[in-house]
Amino acid sequence: MNQRTTLYPLHAQLGAKLIPFAGYDMPVRYTGDKQEHMVVREGVGVFDVSHMGEFIIRGPKALALIQQISSNDASKLYPGKAQYGCMPNFEGGIVDDMIVYHIRHDQYMIVANAANIQKDWDWISASNEGIGAEMIDISDKTSLIAVAGPKADATLQKLAPEG
């Protein structure tokens, strides 16, 4: 049996077509591909991405580890901001893509692909051996949504204004 995200009951109640993906029962559509595509292109859409991996990297060595595993310069990443990039390997190939969030001073969160959670964790752990940052896998304890579309920012500002 596949795992289910925290939002699974809501997906089922709203009539989502659910399919197996990366060990989870995930919604693939509610009404129709074209209609849902246009809603996101012209308005705002919400996606359950709770099946993704989430790793906390923290402590005084956190930035050093992020710099070691990321194709981007995370020293330019301000708290509250994120970078999309990849984890390059030592041969110049790519281990996986990822999103790095700078949560606050000395704390970052990496979002990894659902199908590669263990592989990515192992790569980051091996890269951390000479660095010593604190690493915590919160994948099984975290729900995650993605909000996309040209009206996403305005919609989120209504829900969580700054200050």
Indicate residue ranges for each PLM-predicted region.
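Basic, glycine/lysine-rich polyanion-binding surfaces/domains
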Residues: 1-163
